[in-house]
Amino acid sequence: MSTIEIKNVSKRFKETVALDNVSITLEENKIYGLLGRNGAGKSTLLNIISNRVFPDCGEVLYDGEVMTENDRLQKNIYLMSEKSFYSDNLNVKQIFGWTKEFYPDFDSDYAMKLSKLFGLNIKKKIKQLSTGYSSIFKLILALSVNTPFTFLDEPVLGLDANHRELFYKVLIETYAENPRTFVLSTHLIEEVSKIIEDIIIIKNGQIIRHESTEDLLALGYTVSGPKAAVDAYCAGRNTIGEDTLGSLKVAYCLGQKDTSAADTSLEFSPLDLQKLFVQLTNDADEAAMNL
């Protein structure tokens, strides 16, 4: 089973700590969600894995081998990002042919099929594509290269709702037909919540959660009701956030829910992934504003 292991990786840009001693292992044939606020370190981590940026310390291993400046191992991964490395003067079809030279498993027929499905004009030059179709072009490349590990950094940037839904549908289909690992870094958390199997949450350059989506959602719940009753229930529990409106209060909790010992005035409900993410990544001063 192939793995990518990130070991004790740190990266600083002048005074900004982008990554702080990050360690995590990515397994094959999974769909991960890499979630974090702007500037949390998501893109830096993906750029280090793909050899576009070098860490200050630590290493990235593919099946135990160091990936840095190793072209043989780098062919096992593909990163789709906002930055383009293709000549603006080439058209889409020419880029498909060029990509085949670097990634022998690139499926040209599948790329053409997706182009038709998404309405991408393969005769257009890259510089002629709109923001949305530029993203679609990059997505088609990423879905067609057939690398064991594919990283998608803000994959649906500029896409309308119809194209986003189509992308998620195609992603699930290609994953089912040809299992491999996809890592989606996105802010559209609710849209991907039904797709991702494992969640990685990064905050201020550190991994704060890494577990299955199912397990994390099973831990999160809300308790609401009169402030005094909510406070009494939450005493000694892992409360990750709260909102107060007059005499009423909503608390966001992680852990085992115990309704048997709760005041009858309290209401319990599941915590959706987006709300859970927001509460886990709020800064202290932002959380205080909700008190």
Language model regions located:
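Conserved ABC transporter NBD signature motif
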Residues: 26, 58-73
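Short loop immediately C-terminal to the Walker-B catalytic DE motif
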Residues: 156-157
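Helix-to-loop junction immediately C-terminal to a conserved catalytic motif
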Residues: 50
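ABC-family P-loop ATPase nucleotide-binding domains
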Residues: 72, 81-138
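C-terminal coupling/interaction segments
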Residues: 241-291
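Walker A (P-loop) phosphate-binding loop of ABC-type ATPase nucleotide-binding domains
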Residues: 36-41
